[in-house]
Amino acid sequence: MKKRVLAVVMCALMAGTAFTGFKDAGDDKELVLFTWEGMFPQDVLDDFEKETGVKVVYSNFDIDETMLEKLSMAKGGDYDIVIADDYILETAIQEGLAEKLDKDSLENIGNINPLYQGQFYDPDDEYTVPYGAGIPLIVYDPEQVDIDIKGYKDLWDPSLEDSIALTANYRVINGITQLSMGESMNEEEVDVIKKTGEKLLELAPNVRLIQDDNTQNALLNGEASVAFLYTSQVTAALAENPDLKVVYPEEGLGFGIMGMFIPSEAPDKDAAYSFMDYIMQPEVAAKCTDYIGYYSTNKAADELVNPDLVVPDDVTKGEIVQNVSQDADAQYQKNWTEFKAACD
């Protein structure tokens, strides 16, 4: 759980999936789904094929910037459905890469929880449908940590040297540093962001690893004793070790929404609408929510999902990382590059 101008992350592109999205004319009917790995239970995809005759071809990316770059290179084509984070949705819409939705083709659109509609990235809900929501949190092993962690600022405690696992979203990690300093996660002043970078460098000695996929494993296998995790990773960690302690940071929460959209030049828009509507069926939405471990954005599915994944009353009061100016984003990226180098 965000930028007017986004740098091309070449190393991420090299690491991304090799699937191009192109289909031979002789192939059976296919829908190309482009999102992170592990976002759908296989039986949901298989059942869609049984119901429609459309095979889902799953193409994954590692970070949102990889998705945007590939979709831009394809000029809004190659992929039929994309699921990505809120901030990148705004950029995709601004760059003309998202199809304006025909709501008449989405019978189940009324199942979406209004809490997640009318957001900054799509204020009139013209292009996107929420798929899940979350708040990244601190999780730690109380048997291995000598302090009582209450907020982001505690991550800087010297006793945590070489013990923290972080997710790899540069804006989010800059953002929690800003919250620890009493600043907004969406600060635009470059001089203030530079101070964020200085503070972030002070965290480097405490960082054991930075990775976006399965970050919780470092906590579970003992490589790290503290982790900053996405909602799904928190859920996975607690399922394996319920003795871990979850921290709702006292400085405030970050909050994010994942959304689905149909690319502007999607090869099969009819199949895309069918898939999007299928995913909004309560029973299907509940299966997806339980599988990915994010908060449900489908109010019709709430009574069917794990109660822990029904949105808490105040979760949407958290701050969402949003797009910032070119100069501000460049400084955030500079902070991140220097921080990662210091962690090596």
Residue ranges and their predicted role:
Residues 57-59, 208-210, 245-247:
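General small-molecule cofactor/ligand-binding pocket signal
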Residues 41, 78-79, 83-206, 210-220:
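Extracytoplasmic ligand-binding site segments that recognize negatively charged/polar headgroups
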Residues 194-202, 240-264:
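Periplasmic-binding protein-like
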Residues 89-91, 226-243:
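A ligand-binding cleft/hinge motif common to bilobed small-molecule-binding domains
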Residues 305-344:
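Extracellular/periplasmic bilobal clamshell ligand-binding domains
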Residues 254, 258, 263-320:
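Mature extracytoplasmic/periplasmic domains
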Residues 24-91, 217:
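Early extracytoplasmic/lumenal segment of secretory-pathway proteins
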